[in-house]
Swiss-Prot record:
Keyword Nuclease included in the entry's annotation: no
Matching Pfam families: Rep_trans, RepD-like_N
GO BP terms in the entry: DNA replication
Role noted for this protein: This protein is probably a specific topoisomerase involved in initiating replication. This protein is specifically required and may be rate-limiting for replication of the plasmid in vivo.
Miscellaneous section: The nicking site of REP proteins is sequence, but not plasmid, specific.
Any coiled-coil regions, as ranges: none
Record bears the keyword Ligase: no
UniProt similarity note: Belongs to the plasmid replication initiation factor family.
Protein name per Swiss-Prot or TrEMBL: Replication initiation protein
Organism: Staphylococcus aureus
Record keywords: DNA replication, Plasmid
Amino acid sequence: MSTENHSNYLQNKDLDNFSKTGYSNSRLSGNFFTTPQPELSFDAMTIVGNLNKTNAKKLSDFMSTEPQIRLWDILQTKFKAKALQEKVYIEYDKVKADSWDRRNMRVEFNPNKLTHEEMLWLKQNIIDYMEDDGFTRLDLAFDFEDDLSDYYAMTDKAVKKTIFYGRNGKPETKYFGVRDSDRFIRIYNKKQERKDNADVEVMSEHLWRVEIELKRDMVDYWNDCFDDLHILKPDWTTPEKVKEQAMVYLLLNEEGTWGKLERHAKYKYKQLIKEISPIDLTELMKSTLKENEKQLQKQIDFWQREFRFWK
């Protein structure tokens, strides 16, 4: 199938949402959710694979003359490149891969920033040269048109939690885990980030992102990767005992207090905080993921397989 036919196939199969799922007006059952379903997408991908000697030569020859590629650090057994207006990073290093016993080529990109034609170009001209290829990073992004600074986020697991506050004293960024871990969760004010970076103006009143960065073995669990996460609106006045009210209020407003509790007390108050919250946005995230799981799987299949398009 030619590139033109591939492109037509994408358009004719109603795949305008190939990169991003759209907003939906549906709600979970009950009256708790006034927040629209988030927009869901894969926001970053890393694909690794092996170039054999023949394909390494073919790809190197192609890249050295292709105007859409900027190539540097070129030797017989390695090169680095950026493609498609710097939107794609490509690296090949056979010596390093052999010494570290890992695959020798890596391609990094954000699929949301690529057009259908650019996806096809990247797939046909770069990724299809690789053998034994697979994902080593997937970022799952949920964009909410709601102010998530008013919510309390926590995990059932014992992971490091870091919070950065904005000028108004409200949380602006929350991290769960560490950057090099197999799963790293970011919750941040996307509208403020775009404003700070002089990026595209966001027209909606609020735009917050919950981003789940998955690496290595965790990429296989992209459709079941945040069961332990909770984004809540707990009412600290709900518990009958004043002592429990006071402790919940302290835990919600002074994060350092968690570190002073013994394990059984942490478990008790995490359970209590979940019980006194009528809302858990992660339930909305799960339903959104379930609705869009097939479409997201098609994207993964597109990058990993030869051109056998789904029906």
